[in-house]
Amino acid sequence: MAPLSGEWLEALKDEFHQPYYAKLYKTVMQEYQTRKIFPPADDMFNAFHFTPLSQVKVVILGQDPHHNDGQAHGLCFSVKRDVEVPPSLVNIYQELHDDLGCYIPDNGYLEKWAKQGVLMLNTVLTVRAHQANSHRGIGWEQFTDAAIRILNEQDRPIVFLLWGRPAQMKKSMLNNPKHLILEAPHPSPLSAYRGFFGCHHFSKTNEFLVQNGLDPIDWQIENKAEQENKE
């Protein structure tokens, strides 16, 4: 699997020497060799690759990767450009439209957010094809908890967006008064109507960033053709 590099490698280096990580690594490698696993192994740490620790301004916590073909590429809620936008992301786009007036794009590729400092971290980084939560409990949670603790310790303001109960269970790890914690129900169609719609998390995030002298996030994901023209 593609190793971590740069700032996150330095920040998380102690984890790689822990007994749980040796077991996790062995399990994950065996799974990739014997089963269909998402995301592709080289994309597993993309959340960390795209958003170095020193650049993190916002953290969005997901659960585990999308588990259907061609979707997952290492950023929570995001899918590759040519894949149908998943239901939770449809609802995220709807809230963005209602909150900030963003148009609803034709794809679910969220790399633009990650490149601006939005760490899009699943708490479990791999999954078996078509089996949600199949890698829960194999050790990823310990690893991503270590990342969350490191983020909490940063001596600068960070916004944590905690959507749904699993993400909100991490709130107890976040006790740095510099940070802003925003909570809402999960954007899934099963729960979005309970308060994700109307939460205004995107505008609240930007207000907080600006108040703290930071550039706001440009949340507008462009249509596929426009993204490709910029590359």
Task: Mark where each language-model region is.
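A polyanion-binding, active-site-adjacent surface
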Residues: 2-3, 14-162, 166-169, 174, ...
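Short, contiguous pre-domain boundary segments
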Residues: 5-9
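C-terminal substrate-binding/active-site "lid" region of AdoMet-derived donor-dependent transferases
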Residues: 196
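Acidic, low-complexity intrinsically disordered tails
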Residues: 227-231
